[in-house]
Amino acid sequence: MITRLAIAGYRSIRSLVVDLAPLTVVTGANGSGKSSLYRALRLLADCGEGRVISSLAGVGGLDAVRWAGPERGTMRGQRTEGTLRSGPVSLRLGVATDHLGYAIDLGLPVAQRSAFDLDPQIKQEHVFAGADPRPAGVLVERKHGSARAMADGGWAELARSLHPWASVLDEFAGHAEASELAGARRMLRSWRFHDALRTDATAPARQPQVATRSARLDDDGANLAAVLQTAIEMGGERALSAAIDDAFPGSSLLLPMSDGRMQVALEQPGLLRPLTAPELSDGTLQYLLLTAAMLSAEKPELIVLNEPERSLHVELVPALAARIREAAEATQVVVVTHQAALADALGGTRVELEKVSGETTVAGREGLLDQPVWHWPKR
């Protein structure tokens, strides 16, 4: 389980450390930084997939996402003024778990003639044991082009000339001297994100789908029917039936198949025929998609939901909250929401964000000293 998340130098987040629980609910007003926290988690997952550089380049590079305020921030109530930068531009992301942690420090490229000047560079990476990447707990260390791993006899060199766009998670995941890299990579790659699931008229979830066993929901929901059928065959029929009846009393889920394709249909009281996926309301389809994500046969280490209440009528919120709470019994869940009704129904651990002088902070904290401890390695 993820125990601590640290973000520094990202959009409206100058320095933020939060502890995560089995179910964490992130709330806050519009513009408070909820989306920045969500995107930072996605960037960490991109590190596990080897695409963090391309993801940042795709949105305009480090200049487009770095901390947007003064280098040292602004005291509450004071006027924000520009200052001369004394340190390097840095985007730092880190996560600690019960077993392993991972931290990355990204910076601007050294001035050179290149068509890829928007690409940030990896300055440091650390895989560690414990609550943060302090020296005593570091297991693998990468500084610029050099990388080394802690072995029985001390430090073992892994590389001296790593490319600035190459991560140690990709380059040495199978290295005999650094088995922790494979564990950290596997942890990050297991995370699942669900954001703005499509429910429009041409949404993939409304189309007949290839009938093939599917252990998890695709990002676009294209395998909705297959995920639900897989969950049924893996012992989830009772939970799925309860989820449908909870939201739509007296209704039954059908998964008709023809010519190797299947689709979702809903049999409802008072109707003479089932309604197929193209006929379902946006809210009904959204609920089915989220239910599939929560009940899928594959149980990731982390599920992150960004504003799952979209398109849902308020009457469906208690049923959705029940599905999320049930999922959190087997999988860690982070929910980012601005709906008070959903946040209250979920319970869990609340992290309320607010903006103070343009900077995202956790409501109720007095300052940087009033947050969980995290030591960023120096460059």
Where are these regions (language model features)?
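N-terminal pre-Walker A segment at the start of P-loop NTPase domains
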Residues: 1-14
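Hydrophobic anchor at the beta1->P-loop junction of P-loop NTPases
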Residues: 26
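The conserved Walker
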Residues: 30
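Conserved lysine of the Walker
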Residues: 34
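Conserved P-loop NTP-binding catalytic core
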Residues: 39-111
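Electropositive, glycine-dotted interaction segments
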Residues: 92-234, 238
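Conserved ABC ATPase signature
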Residues: 223, 229, 233, 238, ...
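C-terminal lobe/lid and adjacent interdomain/linker elements of RecA-like ASCE P-loop ATPase modules
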Residues: 319-379
